[in-house]
Amino acid sequence: QGAGKIPFICFDLAGGANIAGSNVLMGKSGGQMDFLSTAGYNKLGLPGDMLPNDPAFVNTELGLAFHSDSGFLRGILQSTSPGTRAATDGAIIAARSENDTGNNPHNPMYGIYKAGANGELLSLVGSQSSESGGNSMAPMSLINPEVRPTKIDRPSDASGLVDVGDLIGILDPSDAVAVMESIQRISDEKMNRVNTEISTDEVVKKLVRCGYVKSADLADRYGKRANPLDPEVDLEIVGPTGIFSRDEFDNNREFRKTASVMKLVLNGYAGAGTITMGGYDYHTGERGTGERRDEQAGRCMGACLEYAARV
């Protein structure tokens, strides 16, 4: 599906999530295990009795060294199978950003598109109606208005991407496609009798013909009762053997958002996508809320990894 590139999903944790140190280990020039000093880790939010130079506080199950008390890690482990974890690799890249602002130009969507990512239906998707599709800005030098991300943050956004009107509701899907094909043939017959009296006569007629044929083709592939774009009907995502239970999916907006974006991107319907989650400024005055939010982000990250392994 799509351009055949590796699917790319960006998690934009608005507010400035604490990634380096308390979630994923950050070391010196020798890599993750080239540990910082006690004072260095303290600046990253780690107390002296939880330093990663103690092997008990390091987890490398995902091919990337996490702090064993990481909320991200707890969430990812809940959403993934042992086989998926064994096949996962990772890296951490240090980048400077400002706190509590959406002005950090770190969103990579347009760069990923420029590298060749594309989808069968959409180039880019994002869970916010912004130029980048997320909370963070896209670098000005990369912005391409032709492929501005389409907003997808719920299952109905994904399933509604292809709308064939009332035909599917009135007729059986196969009958609806037959009607559209008949319309195409009638229109084609009419076009053969029309002289547009312009130099690009054949080009115009070809575009009209292709438009009708493409509409019928989209209706044939996506206009079925069980919409192939709908994450709710994908048993790998929701259900007894799915990544999310039905109760989790119905009652957690972040899970529904994640499922919608990953359904499109990992199946090649979109080239790349951004999932924005809020509240990562940790300004609640206590640690518990931030830990729960980190764990929920981890659940969503793990869901993307697990779904990628399944499809």
Predicted regions: what is each one?
Residues 18-19, 74-221:
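A contiguous, mid-domain pocket- or channel-lining segment that forms the substrate-recognition surface
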Residues 19-28, 102-107, 276, 285-288:
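Short, solvent-exposed loop/turn and secondary-structure capping segments
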Residues 1-70, 75-91, 99-101:
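Intrinsic-disorder/low-complexity recognition with aromatic hotspots
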